[in-house]
Amino acid sequence: METERVKIRQLQVNEQNPRTCTDKRFEKRVSSVITFPKMLEVRQIVVGEGGVALGGNMRLRALQAIATMTDDEIMRHIEQSAKYKDRPECEREALLRYWQKWKHDPMVSVVRTDNMTEDERREFIIKDNVGFGAWDWDMLANDWDTDE
């Protein structure tokens, strides 16, 4: 599978994603993405037909939120992070400049699942574990077989 860069507006959060995320955990995810953007190159968003995210839904949501943030909001995330709290101002400003540039043309690396069957896509969604989310047990019980 090859990666490609696409505009985030071409991607959709998967409404059938059986994971949930509290506001507090989502803010942590946003901060995590802001302070470690290189992770987006290593952990691409996995997309199916129509640009629907099968893996990386919370990262996609975080990027969608970052795309609408002011510089002050982004800097607040940077300054409050343990990683950047004691770093020189020039490093914090460099990270802010990265996001300012990114916001002019918000893109992300994706992997497409065109060569997966529907069953393989469903299996992938279940097995792709993201630590900031929590399971939506009702959705799992209603929409997913326990053997999956």
Identify the role of each PLM range.
Residues M1-T113, E120-E148:
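Short, charged/polar connector segments at secondary-structure boundaries
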